[in-house]
Amino acid sequence: GGPLLNMKGQLIGINSSKYAGVGIEGINFSIPLDTINYVLNQFEQNGKVIRPDLGVTLENSWEARIGLPTKKGVTVKTSSSSSLSNGDVINSINGVEVHSIVDFNKALRDTYSSGSINVIYTRNGEQISTDIVPNLK
């Protein structure tokens, strides 16, 4: 690992691993700076990383899976939540639109402080707003 810098020399992440093989030049993986800052702040405040969890397994749209821009939300694949069901499409978390699982996780991480989380989702064509108290893991 080492610093990942943009063209201006600003730190944007930390290189964490590299995949190389026969006939492959090499693929590098990095941890984004906002994730590093989140983890460091969590350790400073709590002595461990605490993450809100809504008890759902999600599935990206096919557009999001292949990296295309999309306005679709993320689909609930499985749920242990009393509010969300399999097949629901989550559109926003605390007012932040989500179009991929990465967006969902970032919105949870960046907007949750305590109490409940407002989730707007679509079920059978109807848009529904609900507040959910997450499990903290």
Predicted regions and their residues:
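Active-site loop architecture of trypsin-fold serine endopeptidases
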Residues: 1-40
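Residue-level detector of beta-strand face positions
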Residues: 3, 118-120
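Short, well-ordered loop/turn sites that connect or cap secondary structure elements
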Residues: 5, 84-85, 111
